[in-house]
């Protein structure tokens, strides 16, 4: 296998870990989750009339008859098949056989983008709400309203707007993109340089933050894999999330394998020096079984997270890895010692 394919394999997604509700059930149990939902709903969902109305709405709404990976549609959402979307997707073959997917905006969608820019420049939230009534699946409007809801402290509404944006982009994508999300070779790739694609990056990144606020670390990590796999040059700096979330979610073995695969990929086109070195740093790297050449040198979090992951797996090289992290980032070690009152 090539370093590229090995890294892509490490980034393959598990659909069951994409839904935060599954992680909450594993943490607290299904009964506790249902009780919390009934409490938030004031007992209304338990009434037969409410259930029947909701079921009728679900039967009439085509959104509920579609299998999705990125979110679970709600019967209260506008029927996407009866609404204007204005997005499609193209695929381009890259050298080496890799396939890159890109969203495309129609002329009418671009006009909606112009109206969105006017609404944002007015600094009036009601202008965005009015625009959403006309274009209920306009992605940038949904993302902006999600940000407004988050600033107001309504995380539930913020998450609902994010889910709607992701649903619109998933439904407008080609079937190969949707099926490739859970492929064993990793999610499809997208071009971050295309402005039409950046709304997807923004929606996924905000989802990571939202899931982290809820304490669903495993779900957040899975979405980090998706965002990093879209473009492994990491334009959103998602590695700064992975070091924290991998430790919090106890995915220690995966994290160590990912770091090795990432460094092998980034150095696959570089020629290693054949002359042996006898510096103190090289001796520490040898003792820590550290074969990386650059991934850990720039990132404080990755260096210390690797040492912590080795300690969590009871590896004998964990102490040497911690010493190496301190040598690489001495200022961070001083701050940590101050926090620990050492």
Predicted regions and their residues:
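Extreme N-terminal leader/anchor segments
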Residues: 1-126, 134
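Flexible helix-coil transition and linker loops at the boundaries of alpha-helical arrays
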Residues: 130, 169-196, 227, 265-296
